[in-house]
């Protein structure tokens, strides 16, 4: 017994001891508020496993403190009040993630039948010996040019079906075939062949009589309309190569973003084939008197269904009505009889990889004649010709295209994307070019800046002033003072803000990977230069883009397409994955989906897919991508010479697993965003906002150069803006697909992790600032563009803003405002 003669034993369980905190002093209201906040914090910590684990088991016996114990020891065991939470809290990547619905172990998730041999390409040229261009009814001059100069030995299935019909008849036609099957040549070859026939003698030779020869002043004979500027440029390139066998036939383009004065000058000189976007063509028909369509025999609507979706229906109606108002002339100004070589009526051709019955009916109401319309459809290896009914199903992708989908939680999206790119470019020559489709322009800008190396490259052209040329006259000596010369204009680099070297995804095999970005808010010269750089790049390259690049673009050697954000409609998905596996080449397409309701989206895609979509979990991609070291760039520009000690520990992979590497990479990305904001505030206190006009700084702590879209700001501000735009874009799926992309099931905090943010920013429904393109040298001119100058699109500013605006108007009740940054083209 003790000295007082009483001993009481209390049994205390092994559970954690709840700290009892009592506040003294101050006002009663303040003490009560603190007491309630601490109580809420303790309750939340008990429900959180990660925090509950930090509270150890109760000790076997309470430690006794003597009366003379040091104050430091007494304070150590005294319960302390819980302080304010840290401003930046980083959650773990592999905890609290939703469970996928797909069972990856079931054999039903795999393709039903594994073919013993690879699938034969469905959009490749025909191998039949009889299938030659000469057998299609084309002239010998064109057939020889295709085989000798363009190296095209045989036509594709759609060309084999469409060219004879358009050469011999004057009927309207629908051309429906898989992506990459040669639909452009399917309508260009008949046009050039029939125009060329005006210059031919009866024996097929070219007439030498100048009075019977077609030239640029013979009149406009064909008009080709396309929804985007990039597609118009591509069609013009194909037509230019084709017309090398007939250089007297002249073509040109009129598109938004270019100088209307220059376009009018080209039209005034004379053209035979015009390639245009609907808005700009309507503008010229209203204001350019020299543009005469009375001789036009063809109206081609390339991706016509897309033009209607983008809101060009009113423009198309006015174009068709103006062409019908002009009486069709049979003799051109030179007195050449156009018939019967050319059609006796205006022929309208609609071509696309996706056509449904509703769109055909809507377009046919005002542009086609029902009794003179032919549907020419090629489905895979089987060619079918149907007259009255159009299939309502979305057209299938090429059979040689390998499709798969990744089930990735929201928190792991960013690191999984980097791991997929790193593993895809791990071997030299494995993937030369890849395209990443993202939903909105702000997200494209952010991911480009994040994956772009922060280390500035030395300028190649940093040479001293150009030396003076040697004197040409014999009497001159080096001591003779040089003659005054006019200062040369500096060469504008349009790709300075859209092309750069990639980081995180390089390997020993591919030490240099070029990164590109493309969206509709960029100026037209920048868009053209960026696409040209990506197409002609000989190094491994990646293009981060919106849906502006999903239709019609034919970029060589694209082996991988990544849909980082799912398409807004199934038809858009078909066109996205159609950027690879073109003209018989193999290709691979990967779709990112989140666990839960989004997994049901696969069933919708599988209905009309020619091949099965293979499911894949994110862990296999992370293991393949993070099996080796990750080259982390410096967080700030002040640390370019070497990494921090903490990052050096992260790079030591001898004891690291793929999970720890993924978490280290995510932590590095978050620190990089925070460092960009901190360095910006330290360099200039006035440049705090994303849209600050003065004093804005980059993630490297240096003054931020104005990008092609006129925006400046830190990487952290860019990530927040990209997050807001992504959430708004998530709500714009078509009605039939919203059951799979449910806003109520989207975890905003986890999604913020995919943008390198540690918490979800607010202001999602408060509207966005409209992008403005300021006149600069990088934008291709000094004149300020107005709505009337562009003439392309609903607001005559961007040809791709119309569709996003239309869809966002439907969602204004949910998100609160329209969004102009969703430029998908």
From Swiss-Prot:
The keyword RNA-binding applies. ATP binds at residues 177-184. One of its GO terms (biological process) is endonucleolytic cleavage in ITS1 upstream of 5.8S rRNA from tricistronic rRNA transcript (SSU-rRNA, 5.8S rRNA, LSU-rRNA). Residues 49-60, 109-125, 676-686 have a biased composition (Low complexity). GO terms for molecular function: ATP binding; ATP hydrolysis activity; RNA binding; RNA helicase activity. It catalyses: ATP + H2O = ADP + phosphate + H(+). It comes from the Eukaryota. Its EC number is 3.6.4.13. CDD domains: DEADc_DDX31 (cd17949), SF2_C_DEAD (cd18787). GO terms for cellular component: nucleolus. Residues 83-102 have a biased composition (Polar residues). A motif (DEAD box) lies at residues 302-305. It is an enzyme of class 3 (hydrolase). Residues 164-373 form the Helicase ATP-binding domain. ATP-binding RNA helicase involved in the biogenesis of 60S ribosomal subunits and is required for the normal formation of 25S and 5.8S rRNAs. The Q motif is unique to and characteristic of the DEAD box family of RNA helicases and controls ATP binding and hydrolysis. Present with 1460 molecules/cell in log phase SD medium. This is ATP-dependent RNA helicase DBP7. It comes from Pyricularia oryzae (strain 70-15 / ATCC MYA-4617 / FGSC 8958). The lineage of its organism: Eukaryota, Fungi, Dikarya, Ascomycota, Pezizomycotina.
